[in-house]
């Protein structure tokens, strides 16, 4: 019966991924079939954690987060959880022998979102990004290299750069919602009451540097994941280019996005670039 519950748990993680993120789902479908489920399992866990701190405003979020964290610890210890999302995540956690530090750092950053509203220095900012994004990239990297420690260490810095780039693009895209609805400001030393073109351009230059380093690592990924990760890169880099063209005052007043029809165009472009070795 545990086998059936595991199948149901994995279906839940897949459903969460496809319901919350069309872009991530599209990129995951470009991975080898053998590893897609493990990426769904990771994303489902990440998404559920984020949902608690970002969306459930009518409930005691700290209480819910504490319960969730306790359930997470027990699921890893006992190798089962009645929460299907945690049950599928713990399966992937043990399958690839994740370092528990990755999970702990992620949960630390999520907990900061309950109370910490402003990041006034680079140290806290970098620590938050490491916990909220870089470690997720490292979990996925574990899956891509099938637990190969040597390969993991070779690609670690690139996975972190790509995770940082993706997260910073999210921050810039969600500036309006984070600032107005969640009262959060992630970028240090930026006055969001007077968000200037110079502020925007400095942030974009930082993100472009992360993308440049992250792209180097995509070339070195195994065949099982290279195209899928490149597809995700193309989506986020295209979103960054769109943000770059958008005046700073509009970034604070609207949410910039890539329409679904354009995502399909990016997928086709990614396929062409990948198969003809014209990465950009």
Description of each model-found segment:
Residues 1-168, 172-280:
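Catalytic cores of Mg2+-dependent Asp-rich isoprenoid enzymes
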């Amino acid at each position: 019966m545990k086998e059936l519950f595991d199948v149901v748990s994995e279906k839940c993680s897949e459903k969460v991924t496809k319901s919350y993120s069309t872009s991530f789902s599209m990129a995951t479908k470009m991975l080898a079939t053998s590893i897609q489920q493990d990426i769904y399992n990771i994303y489902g866990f990440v998404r559920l954690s984020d949902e608690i701190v970002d969306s459930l405003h009518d409930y005691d979020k700290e209480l819910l987060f504490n319960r969730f964290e306790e359930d997470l610890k027990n699921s890893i210890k006992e190798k089962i959880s009645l929460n299907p999302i945690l049950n599928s995540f713990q399966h992937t956690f043990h399958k690839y022998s994740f370092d528990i530090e990755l999970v702990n750092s992620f949960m630390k950053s999520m907990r900061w979102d309950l109370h910490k509203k402003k990041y006034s220095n680079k140290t806290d900012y970098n620590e938050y990004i490491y916990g909220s994004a870089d470690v997720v990239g490292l979990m996925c990297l574990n899956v891509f290299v099938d637990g190969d420690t040597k390969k993991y260490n070779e690609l670690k810095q690139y996975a972190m750069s790509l995770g940082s780039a993706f997260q910073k693009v999210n921050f810039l895209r969600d500036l309006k919602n984070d600032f107005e609805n969640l009262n959060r400001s992630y970028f240090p030393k930026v006055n969001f009451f007077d968000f200037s073109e110079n502020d925007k351009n400095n942030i974009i230059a930082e993100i472009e540097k992360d993308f440049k380093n992250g792209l180097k690592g995509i070339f070195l990924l195994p065949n099982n994941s290279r195209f899928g990760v490149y597809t995700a890169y193309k989506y986020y880099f295209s979103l960054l280019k769109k943000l770059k063209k958008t005046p700073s005052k509009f970034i604070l007043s609207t949410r910039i996005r890539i329409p679904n029809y354009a995502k399909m165009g990016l997928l086709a472009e990614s396929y062409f670039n990948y198969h003809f070795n014209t990465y950009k």
